[in-house]
Amino acid sequence: RSLLLSAGERISMSLLALAINEAGVPATAFTGAQAGLRTDGQYGKASIVGVVPERVARAVREGSVAIVAGFQGLDYDTDNVNTLGRGGSDTTAVALAASLGADVCEIYTDVDGLFTADPRIVPTARRITSISSEETLELAAHGAKILHLRAVEFARRYHVPLHVRSSFSDKEGTWIHTSKQEDTVEAPIISGIAHDRSNDKLTIVGVRDQPGFAARIFSLLAGAGVQIDTIVQDVATAGNGFTNISLTIPEGYAAAAQEVLAGAKEELGISDLQFNPNVGTLSLVGAGMRSHPWVSAKLFDALFQAGINIHLISSSEIRISVVVDDDRLDDAVRAVHTAFDLDADQIEAVVYGGTGR
């Protein structure tokens, strides 16, 4: 299966090499295996465990343009072709840049970089000129689609600067820096807003407020392979002895979560499982917010003024996320974007290729 799935990239790299050679520039095509990319054994969603790009480096030294098929590598144990899953091509590019000691890894897409919000929802979103890898990770993890989370994680781990730009324009894109930047007076407090419709809300009602019960619940979910995004536990009512735990989980894991918890309702004394698939998450991201306590007040006031109810709230040092009704998510993004003065005076975002990436 992986051999078949990787065929498209192999054909594309070969055709591109032929075209470049015909234009009078030497070019050499490499499969992931030929480029020295080794993976673990998780077929279809493998991780890169090593890169030895000797042939790629030699081709470049000899004046050839090296073209490497993304999304694939060689299983470290079996030497079989393996595929990397979502974000595999971006991650391949970053891995090669790191192993070759490149000054920068440029990721080409169909827009001029990262924007303060999805331009399809907020046409006046601003282009972000520079952003930290930590902020980019938060945006990517909470719905921003331009750059995949795995690629950003790899870049941060190996200190590879990223430049995200358009394939159809010479404009400067967005620089993602991995070194710690000094805070300045001019530094933006908020970098951007991400939104995500791919999570469902599950509330576990009537959990005993005693040591061990929450641990048992999350052990069951982990055993079923359920991924969890947000966790919120209510404070137990005085004298009641029970609490509620609310989760947001990727929609593909909802059935497994409900099944495993339903089977343990009697054991754990759970009184009810409440499932809501009609929710969306808005995440406000910015390294500057940690020293500005008014940020959360402005966020909640903007949602209040727009008449939007909040289901759940979670946060990190540089992010505040709120779960709202799905049919009000776009309104929430626009309201918060305007409240934090992120709107541009004119439309900056242009989708050149229409791929939606």
Segments (PLM) and residue ranges:
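Short hydrophobic alpha-helical runs that function as membrane-insertion/retention elements
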Residues: 104-108, 162-164, 229-230, 311-312
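Internal glycine-rich alpha/beta core junctions
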Residues: 160, 165-167, 171
